[in-house]
UniProtKB/Swiss-Prot annotation:
Full protein name: Protein qua-1
Biased composition (Polar residues): 840-855
Comp. bias (Gly residues): 312-337, 526-536, 545-572, 605-634, 656-700, 727-752, 775-791, 907-923
Record-linked Pfam families: Hint
InterPro entries xref list: Dev_Signal_Hedgehog-like, Hedgehog, Hedgehog_Hint, Hint_dom_C, Hint_dom_N, Hint_dom_sf, Intein_N
GO CC terms, sorted: cuticular extracellular matrix; cytoplasmic vesicle; extracellular matrix; extracellular region
Keyword Secreted listed: yes
Ranges of compositional bias, category Basic and acidic residues: 511-523, 753-774
Signal peptide: 1-22
Record organism: Caenorhabditis elegans
Keyword Secreted annotated: yes
Annotated GO biological process: cell-cell signaling; intein-mediated protein splicing; molting cycle, collagen and cuticulin-based cuticle; nematode larval development; nematode male tail mating organ morphogenesis; protein autoprocessing
Organism lineage: Eukaryota, Metazoa, Ecdysozoa, Nematoda, Chromadorea
Length: 1169
C-alpha cells in the first residue's frame, strides 16, 4: 500500500507531460504533400496531385527511404517515422511530364525556407533564434509573408488535413527533419516563368537573386546545414563553390562561360563531306580536326565538339576546327583537290578570328560567298587554329578527330572511305582517320572526274581495277570503312536503276533559328541501274555476259540477259522488253520465238520455251502473259490453244481463252465454272453456269449480278414476290430473294419487317400468298433474313457486339464468329436440318425457347448467321438439285420468341424467321431459323455477357462491377476507377435528391487484371456507362424515372427498384447529372457490348455512387439493392467492431465470402431470389 501511494503521484504527473507522436503521412496516386497553411506552431498539410507551372496530370517516380527530397522536381509523398524521436524517412515523388518532351520548361526553380516546430518539452521557454548571419537556414525577405520567428512557443502540431478548397498549391514539402528540440520542415514555393522567356532569355541571373534557392543542384544530404551567407559568398566569389550550387539553366539558355567553338573538317582528295556548322552549338552533326582540350560549356547541350584548332592535315588539305569554348574561333585550312562541296556556314563567335577553312570548297560564310582558303588560318584564343597547312598525301592525322571521312590514308592512290575509328594523339600513327584501305583499292572507270564519288559502292560505277586516281572512280570496295565498292558489279546490285545524279552535293545550312538541315540533291537522269539481282554482269552500258538466275527491274531482268545479254536464263522480264536465249528477257531484243506482250507490264515477250506453270505461263510453248489464279496452270494463257482450265479456285477469270463464265468460285472444268448466283459474281458469266444452290438461275436476282441462264426451279413459278412493307422488289435482307429459282408456289418467305422498327412490322400478310406446303423453292435467305433484321430498313435495337481487344469497334464477318465462339454455348447445333447450310445457325426449338421464356432472355447459338443482327451471311451451297433451297416459309415447325409468343411460318412474321425444315423437291438445302434482334430481348440475345455456364438467364458470373476507365467525382476532381483508393471521398446520391461526398469504406470487389464483358449504355445526354450485366442499376420507364426526379425521396425509391444492367432497354431511362448538377431522367439511346480488363466495385455508406455522371448502385450478384444494403451494413459493423477494416491501399479484393453465400441462398431460401 505504501508503494502504491508513492507511485500514484508519479502516474498523475505523467499525464501532464507533453507527448510526441510519430509521423506517418501517405499520399498515393501521384499526389504529394502540400502545405495548406502554417503558423501558431501548426502546419496543416494535405495530399494533392500537383499542377505545376501550367503543366497538369504529372506523374511520380518514387524513391523510398530518403532522408530528404533534393532536386528541382523532387517533393515529399510519404512520411514515416518509426518512433517519436526516430529520424524521419521520406518517399520522394520525382515529378515528370508523361507527355512528349517529358519536361516542365516553365518551372525554373523553387524558393525555399525552413520552418521550425519546437518540441513541447521546452515547457514554455522562449526559443531564441540564432543570429541572422550564422543562421543555418534561409528565410524569405518579406517578413509579412512568412514570419521569421515566433515568441513564446511551447509546442508544435504537424497535421494532415483533407483539402477544403481547390486553390492551386503554392507551398510544397521538401523534407522533415527530426531534431532534439522539435522538427524542422523545409517548405518550397515553385518559381515559374513563361515558355517564351525560357526559350529566348539568354541573360544570366540577376544580381542579388538567391541562385541556390533552386534545389536543382542538390546532390548530397548537406541541405540542412546550408546557410544564407554561404549563398551570398558563393554568388560573390564564384569559382568552385558557385559551380557547386549554381542554378541549372533550362535547355536553350546560354551561359556566360563563352562562345562554343565550332568544329573543323579534315579534308582530303575526294573527301565527300556533309557539313552543318554553327559556332553557337546548334548544329546536330559535327566532326573535328583536333582534340578538345577544355570542358564543354553549358551552352553546348547538343553533340558539338569544341576542339582545339590544331587541325589534322589530311591528304592534300585538312580543315581546322574552331577554338575551344570561351576562346573564340580559330581555323586552319589546307588546300585540297577534287572536293566538290557546297557549304553555307553561320558563325557566332564572341572573340577570335571567326575564321572558316574548308578544303577546296564553294563556301558561303554569313551570306558572303567565294571564300577559299589554302593553308592559312587565324590563331586566336585557347589552342585555337594552328592553321593546317596544305598537307601532303601521306600527312599523318595529328590529333585526328572522329575521322568521319576517312582522311589521311596511307596509300597514295587509294580513295578515302568512311573511316570509323577515332584518331589518336600520336602524330606518327598514320591510320588514325579510318583504315589504310580507305574503302577502295584504287579503281578506275566510273564516274567522270570531279563528280561526287563517296566510295560507298552504291553509285553506277563499274571500274575494273587499277585505274588512276584522277579519273575519280571506285575500286572493288574492299575497304574497311563503311563503303562497299561496286567494283566489277560482282556484288548484288539493286536491280532498280538508281538516279544518276550530277555528282554534286548541294548543302544548305541556315541561321541558328532555322530547322532545315542538309538537303542532298540527287536528282538526275535515270541511269540504267544494275543488271538484276543475280550474278548477271549487265551494266549501265548494256554490256552483260554470262548466265544469271535473278530477276530485277530496270534494265534487264532476267538472268543473263543484261541488255544485250547472250546467256541463257529462266526468269521473267519486266518493262515490256525481251531478252535473248531461253526465258523471258527484257529490253527490246527479239528471241527465238514470237510472243505477244500484255498491257505494258508483267513480263516481256518470252522467247523460246517458257517453263513455268501456275502463275505466269500458259501451255508449254505459249508465250503467255501472267495469269492471276492460284491453281496450277490457271492463267489466261493466251497461247496457242486455250490455257489449262481453272482448277479448284480460280480467282478472277475462269479458264482459258475458249472458256467463258467468270465465276469467283469456279467448280472445276464445267464450261465457264459455276456462277455464284445464277450468273456468278464475276465479270459477265453468260455461260450456262449453275445457280447458287442447284437452281439454274431462275427469273429472280442472283446474289450480286443478274444471271441470264434460263434454268428454272422446281415448278418454274416466279412466286408472288410478296415482300414486307419495305423493299418491294424482294431482293435482299429480309424481304426475300423471292423469285430466286422458286419452288412450287414460291412461298414468299417470312416476309420482312420493312420500314418499321418494332417486332410487329412485316406482319401484314406478307407471306400469306404462298401456300403452306410450298417450302421448297423461294425464300432462299429471305425468310431467315427477315428473321435476322427484318429487312434492310429494319431496326436491330442498336445492339453492338464490339471488338474483344479494342472494345468499341463493331464486328463483322468472321471476327464476330470468333468473338461469339468465346462466349457460352447454350443451345444445340444449328444444322439440325439440311446439309446445305454449313455455317451453323440457330436451332430455336420449342424446348430452348420455353426454357428462356421464363426470364425473357432468349438463348442464342454461339455461332450465328447474323452480323450485328443484320444481313444474313450466305450459307454454303445446298445439296439439292433444284430450287434455291435454303429455307421455305412453310409451317413445318413453329418456334417461340423471347417473349413467349409462338409464331408460325405462314404468318410471315419478321420476329423469328421460321420455316426451318422446308425442303426442296430434290434436295434438303434447309436453313435453320435465325433469332432476330427484337426490341425486347436483343441485348441479352446478342451476348450473354455474364453467364458462365448453361444456366441461361438465371446464371451469374463473378465479374460484376465497373470497368477500369469509369470515372467518379472526388473532392479533388475526377478519378478513374482504377485510381480510386480507400479513404477517397466520392460524390454519391442521397435522399432529397441531394448530392454529397461519402468516403470509400472498402472495395466490394477489385480485380485489376481480370478480363470480362461489359454492358455499355449510351444516353441521350451523351453519357456512356460501362458495367457488367449483373450489376444493379436504377433503370425504368422514362415516365417513372421522371417521377423519381420530382419526388423528394425519389432517389431512394429508384435505388430500391434497381435491376440488373443487362435488363436495360433502349428507350428506358437512367438517372444522370446534368451540367448544372441537377438529377435528370436520361433516356438510353443505345445498348452496346465490350470487353475490357479490370473490374472495380467501391463501397460507400449510402451503397451508391455516381459513375460517369450516372447514378448507380455499388452492388451486384443479388437483384435487390435493399438486401445488399443490409448485408453490407452487417459486414461493415462487424469489421469495424473488430478492427478489420483495411484503410491502406488495396490491389486485389475478391468478393466477400458472405456475399457469395447469400447469392447461393438466394436461389432457394431468401425472399429476393
Amino acid at each position: 500500500m505504501r508503494r502504491l501511494s508513492a507511485i500514484l503521484p508519479i502516474l498523475l504527473l505523467s499525464n501532464f507531460w507533453p507527448t510526441v507522436e510519430s509521423l506517418n503521412y501517405k499520399c498515393h496516386n501521384d499526389q504529394i504533400l502540400v502545405v495548406q497553411s502554417f503558423g501558431n506552431d501548426t502546419i496543416r498539410m494535405h495530399c494533392q496531385r500537383l499542377d505545376l507551372c501550367g503543366y497538369q496530370k504529372l506523374k511520380c517516380d518514387y524513391d523510398e527511404l530518403q532522408p530528404q527530397c533534393g532536386g528541382k522536381l523532387n517533393f515529399v509523398s510519404h512520411v514515416n517515422q518509426k518512433g517519436s524521436t526516430a529520424p524521419v524517412e521520406h518517399t520522394c515523388c520525382n515529378l515528370f511530364n508523361p507527355r512528349s518532351h517529358h519536361s516542365i520548361p516553365t518551372h525554373i526553380g523553387n524558393d525555399c525556407f525552413i520552418y521550425e516546430l519546437p518540441d513541447g518539452s521546452s515547457n514554455g521557454k522562449k526559443v531564441d533564434p540564432a543570429p541572422a548571419d550564422d543562421a543555418p537556414y534561409a528565410v524569405l525577405k518579406n517578413p509579412a509573408e512568412i514570419p521569421e520567428q515566433f515568441d513564446g512557443v511551447t509546442g508544435y502540431r504537424l497535421r494532415l488535413f483533407l483539402l477544403k478548397n481547390k486553390s492551386p498549391p503554392t507551398l510544397l514539402v521538401k523534407g522533415i527533419e527530426r531534431r532534439l528540440d522539435g522538427y524542422r520542415v523545409t517548405i518550397c514555393r515553385p518559381r515559374c516563368t513563361s515558355y517564351d522567356k525560357v526559350v529566348n532569355d539568354n541573360e544570366g541571373a540577376e544580381d542579388g537573386e538567391w541562385k541556390a534557392i533552386s534545389w536543382s543542384s542538390w546532390s548530397s544530404s548537406s541541405w540542412s546545414t546550408w546557410a544564407r551567407h554561404a549563398f551570398n559568398k558563393a554568388a560573390a566569389e564564384g569559382g568552385e563553390a558557385a559551380e557547386r550550387i549554381r542554378t541549372r539553366m533550362p535547355i536553350g539558355e546560354k551561359t556566360v562561360a563563352g562562345a562554343a567553338g565550332a568544329t573543323g573538317a579534315a579534308g582530303s582528295d575526294k573527301s565527300n563531306i556533309n557539313i552543318h556548322v554553327e559556332s553557337n552549338g546548334n548544329n546536330n552533326n559535327s566532326f573535328e580536326g583536333g582534340r578538345s582540350s577544355s570542358e564543354k560549356s553549358d551552352g553546348q547541350l547538343n553533340r558539338e565538339i569544341s576542339g582545339s584548332s590544331e587541325a589534322g592535315a589530311g591528304g592534300k588539305g585538312g580543315a581546322g576546327a574552331d577554338g575551344a569554348a570561351g576562346s573564340g574561333a580559330g581555323a586552319g585550312a589546307g588546300a585540297g583537290t577534287n572536293g566538290n562541296i557546297n557549304i553555307t556556314v553561320h558563325t557566332d563567335g564572341k572573340s577570335g578570328g571567326n575564321a572558316v577553312a574548308v578544303a577546296n570548297a564553294n563556301v558561303t560564310v554569313n551570306g558572303a560567298g567565294g571564300v577559299s582558303t589554302t593553308g592559312t588560318g587565324a590563331q586566336t584564343g585557347n589552342e585555337s587554329g594552328l592553321g593546317g597547312s596544305a598537307g601532303t598525301d601521306k600527312a599523318g592525322g595529328k590529333k585526328g578527330g572522329h575521322g568521319d571521312s576517312g582522311d589521311s590514308g596511307n596509300n597514295k592512290n587509294k580513295d578515302n572511305g568512311k573511316g570509323k575509328g577515332k584518331g589518336k594523339n600520336d602524330e606518327e600513327d598514320e591510320e588514325d582517320n579510318g583504315d589504310e584501305d580507305g574503302n577502295g583499292k584504287g579503281g578506275n572507270g566510273g564516274n567522270p572526274k570531279g563528280e561526287w564519288d563517296d566510295g560507298d559502292g552504291d553509285e553506277d560505277d563499274d571500274g575494273t581495277d587499277g585505274g588512276s586516281k584522277e579519273s575519280g572512280n571506285n575500286g572493288k570496295g574492299k575497304g574497311k570503312g563503311s563503303g562497299d565498292g561496286d567494283g566489277n558489279r560482282n556484288g548484288n546490285g539493286d536491280g532498280n536503276g538508281r538516279p544518276k545524279g550530277d555528282g554534286n552535293i548541294k548543302i544548305n545550312i541556315h541561321s541558328p533559328d532555322d530547322n532545315d538541315l542538309l538537303e542532298k540533291d540527287e536528282n538526275g537522269p535515270n541511269g540504267k541501274g544494275g543488271a538484276g539481282n543475280g550474278n548477271g554482269d549487265g551494266d549501265k552500258d548494256n554490256n552483260g555476259k554470262g548466265n544469271g538466275t535473278g530477276d530485277g527491274d530496270g534494265d534487264g531482268n532476267g538472268n543473263g540477259n543484261g541488255l544485250t545479254g547472250d546467256g541463257n536464263g529462266t526468269g521473267d522480264g519486266d518493262n515490256n522488253e525481251s531478252g535473248n536465249g531461253n526465258g523471258d528477257g527484257s529490253d527490246k531484243n527479239s528471241g527465238a520465238g514470237a510472243g505477244t506482250k500484255p498491257e505494258n507490264r508483267e513480263g516481256g515477250d518470252g522467247n523460246g520455251n517458257g517453263t513455268g506453270d501456275g502463275n505466269g505461263d500458259g501451255n508449254d510453248n505459249g508465250n503467255g502473259s501472267k495469269g492471276l489464279g492460284t491453281g496450277s496452270g490457271d492463267g489466261k494463257g493466251e497461247g496457242n490453244k486455250s490455257g489449262t482450265p481453272g482448277k479448284s479456285d480460280g480467282k478472277e477469270d475462269g479458264a482459258g481463252s475458249n472458256g467463258s463464265g467468270n465465276g469467283k468460285e469456279g467448280d472445276g472444268n464445267k464450261s465457264g465454272g459455276s456462277g455464284k448466283g445464277g450468273a456468278g459474281n464475276g465479270k459477265s458469266g453468260d455461260g450456262s453456269g449453275d445457280g447458287k444452290n442447284n437452281g439454274n438461275g431462275g427469273t429472280g436476282d442472283g446474289k450480286d449480278k443478274n444471271g441470264k441462264g434460263s434454268g428454272s426451279g422446281d415448278n418454274d413459278k416466279s412466286g408472288t414476290r410478296a415482300a414486307g412493307k419495305g423493299n418491294a422488289e424482294g431482293n435482299g435482307k429480309g424481304n426475300g430473294n423471292d423469285g430466286k429459282g422458286s419452288g412450287s408456289g414460291d412461298g414468299s418467305g417470312a416476309g420482312g419487317k420493312g420500314d418499321k422498327s418494332d417486332s410487329e412490322s412485316g406482319n401484314e400478310a406478307d407471306g400469306k400468298d404462298g401456300k403452306k406446303n410450298e417450302g421448297a423453292g423461294g425464300e432462299a435467305a429471305a425468310g431467315s433474313g427477315g428473321a435476322n433484321k427484318g429487312g434492310s430498313d429494319g431496326d436491330d435495337d442498336d445492339v453492338d457486339v464490339t471488338d474483344v481487344e479494342v472494345g468499341t469497334k463493331p464486328l463483322t464477318g468472321t471476327k464476330l464468329e470468333e468473338l461469339l465462339a468465346k462466349l457460352p454455348n447454350e443451345t444445340a447445333d444449328g444444322n439440325a436440318t439440311g446439309d446445305g447450310n454449313e455455317f451453323g445457325t440457330v436451332q430455336t426449338g420449342a424446348k430452348h425457347n420455353a426454357e428462356s421464356s421464363a426470364s425473357g432472355i432468349p438463348l442464342v447459338q454461339a455461332r450465328s448467321n447474323t452480323v450485328n443482327g443484320g444481313a444474313p451471311v450466305p450459307p454454303a451451297p445446298g445439296s439439292g438439285a433444284t430450287g434455291s433451297g435454303t429455307s421455305g416459309s412453310g409451317t413445318s415447325e413453329s418456334v417461340t420468341n423471347g417473349s413467349g409468343a409462338t409464331e408460325s411460318g405462314s404468318t410471315g412474321s419478321g420476329t423469328t424467321g421460321t420455316g426451318t425444315s422446308g425442303t426442296g423437291s430434290s434436295g434438303t438445302g434447309a436453313s435453320a431459323a435465325r433469332t432476330s434482334s427484337i426490341a425486347g430481348d436483343a441485348p441479352q440475345a446478342a451476348v450473354l455477357a455474364d453467364t458462365p455456364g448453361a444456366a441461361g438467364a438465371a446464371g451469374g458470373g463473378r465479374s460484376n462491377c465497373f470497368s477500369a476507365d469509369s470515372l467518379v467525382t472526388t473532392v479533388t476532381g475526377q478519378k478513374r476507377m482504377d485510381e480510386l483508393q480507400i479513404g477517397d471521398y466520392v460524390l454519391v446520391p442521397s435522399s432529397g435528391n441531394v448530392l454529397k461526398y461519402e468516403k470509400v469504406e472498402m472495395f466490394y470487389h477489385r480485380e485489376p487484371k481480370t478480363r470480362t464483358n461489359f454492358v455499355v449504355l449510351y444516353t441521350k445526354s451523351g453519357r456512356k456507362l460501362s458495367l457488367t450485366g449483373r450489376h444493379l442499376l436504377p433503370v425504368a420507364e422514362c415516365s417513372q424515372v421522371e417521377q423519381y426526379t420530382m419526388n423528394p425521396d425519389g432517389i431512394d425509391v429508384a435505388m430500391r427498384e434497381s435491376k440488373y444492367a443487362e435488363k436495360a432497354r433502349k428507350g428506358e431511362c437512367v438517372l444522370s447529372i446534368d451540367e448544372s448538377g441537377e438529377v435528370i431522367a436520361d433516356e438510353i439511346v443505345r445498348v452496346g457490348r465490350m470487353t475490357n480488363v479490370g473490374i472495380y466495385s467501391p463501397m460507400t455508406v449510402e451503397g451508391s455512387l455516381i459513375v460517369d455522371g450516372v447514378l448507380s448502385s455499388c452492388f451486384s450478384h443479388l437483384e435487390s439493392h435493399s438486401a445488399h444494403k443490409l448485408i453490407f451494413d452487417f459486414i461493415y459493423y462487424v469489421y469495424n467492431a473488430f478492427g478489420l477494416l483495411n484503410t491502406n491501399h488495396v490491389d486485389l479484393q475478391p468478393i466477400p465470402t458472405f456475399v457469395s453465400f447469400a447469392q447461393y441462398l438466394s436461389k432457394t431460401v431468401l425472399p429476393f431470389s
